[in-house]
Amino acid sequence: MSKSPILSSRTLVLIVFSIAINMLGGQISSMIKLPIFLDSIGTLICALLAGPWIAVLTGLLTNLLWGLLSGPIAAAFAPVAMMIGLSAGLLAHAGLFRTLPRVILSGVIITLALMLVAVPIRTYLFAGTTGSGADFFVAYFHAVGENLLESVAITVLGANIADKILSALIAWLLVRRLPLRAQQNFPHMARVR
C-alpha cells in the first residue's frame, strides 16, 4: 500500500478554501474594526485536516495574497500566520484538539507562540499601529505609561487570546461535524474526538 501524497488535489482544494475563509473572516473583522482578527480559522482547519506544514503553507499564501490585494501590512504578518499554522498543527497531532478544554488550551498556546513573532513585527515595523481595531488598545496602554513594546505585547496577547480561542473552537467544531467519508479524504488528519 502506498502512502498518499501530502499535496493531493483534495489538499490543494482545502488550501484554497481555507485561504478564502481566512480572508473573509479577516475582512469582516477589519471592516467593522473588531479588536480581534478572525483571519486564521481556515489555517486552523488545515492544521486539523492536513497537518502543520499544509497549515504553514496556507497561512503564508493567505497573507501574501492578502498583501497583494489590500496592501503590504498583511504580507508583513505572514510569519505570524505561519507560526499559527505550525503551532496549531503540532498541537493537533499531539492530541490537544480532542476535547473542549484542550481546544481552549490550544488557543492559549497558539497565542503565546504567535506573540514571539507578532510583537516584534508590530512594534518595530509599524510602531504599534497597523490600522486594526487593536490600535486603540496600544494607544491607551502607551498613554497610561507603558512603553511601546509592553503596550504592543499586552494588546497582542489580549486581542489574540480571545481570537485564537474562538478561531480554534470554530475550526474544531467544523472539523468534528465533517462526515466520516469526508474525513477519510485527509490521511494526515489529527484526531478531534
Please annotate each region the language model reported.
Residues 1-49, 53-64:
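Hydrophobic transmembrane alpha-helices
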Residues 14, 39, 43-44, 58-62, ...:
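Alpha-helical transmembrane segments of multi-pass membrane proteins, especially transporters
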Residues 23-38, 60-99, 126:
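Interfacial aromatic-anchored transmembrane helix boundaries in multi-pass membrane proteins
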Residues 31-33, 72-76, 97-193:
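Membrane-embedded alpha-helical hairpins and interfacial helices in multi-pass inner-membrane proteins
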Residues 44, 63, 85-89, 119, ...:
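Transmembrane alpha-helix boundary and packing residues in multipass membrane permease domains
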